[in-house]
Amino acid sequence: MKVSTHNHWDPLEEIVVGIADHARVPTVDRSTMSMSYTNHPMDLIKPLEGEYPKWLIDEANEDLQGLSDVLSKAGIKVHRPIPIDHSKEFSTPEWKTTGWYTWCPRDLLLPMDNLVIETPSACRARQYETRAYRDIMLEAIADGVEWIAAPKPTLPDEGYQFDDIEGKPSLLNLEPIFDAPNCVRLGKDILFQISNTGNHWGLKWLQNVLEHRGYRIHPAEHIYSYGHFDSTIVPLRPGLVLLNSSRVTAENCPKVFEKWDKIWFDDCVAQGSKIPGGVA
């Protein structure tokens, strides 16, 4: 597998498409709540622990296979992860948890040029998720790709706050943490989102790793704190960006887009859920 990527708009040549096998709601703890359920009470989420319904996993796998087939027919090389049992419990001296899922390869692997960074997730349940991509990454190394991993975070309970989830992220700034989609890649410019999945220590670590390689890392704060930037800012080509008008305004729009043409769209609308409690 060869990696050479600099942005979000170049023609696609290779891709990793995830799988839904063994997907579940993991052990519900402060990291799980911070990652995905910040605006839900824990007593609503806790009973959902366990594997997702079979119909949901089957439908998700059918959709993912359909996507893989479409991409393959378009001449794109598609890689798939190996199934791993997310029900297996693992631990550190401070906590224990089960795993979560393997349908979001883009969350934990950040490609920059021919470098792939394994990112330090804010969620305990995702600390060993990249095992599913090990064979793909070994193939990439054999083809000359440089693979590095950020320091594994300790993720203590005190690393999260839920007293003011509207005013600031639930993730605190105790150690380097970020997901790959906290980063918007614009060639040598990278927009770094401060949110529930990325903090200032994560920003500093990435600056230390990438700035001597010629990259410029631009922090983006007070725009959207619930997770990733892909429902907020999407660069379409050089000089044209798609922006969520319910979050991005003329006042808080990142300066890197100051001279770009902008397309504004209304906020994303949830389509509902068949999961108990309406939890996505």
Task: Enumerate the predicted regions with their spans.
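The feature marks the mature, well-folded catalytic cores of soluble enzymes
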Residues: 1-280
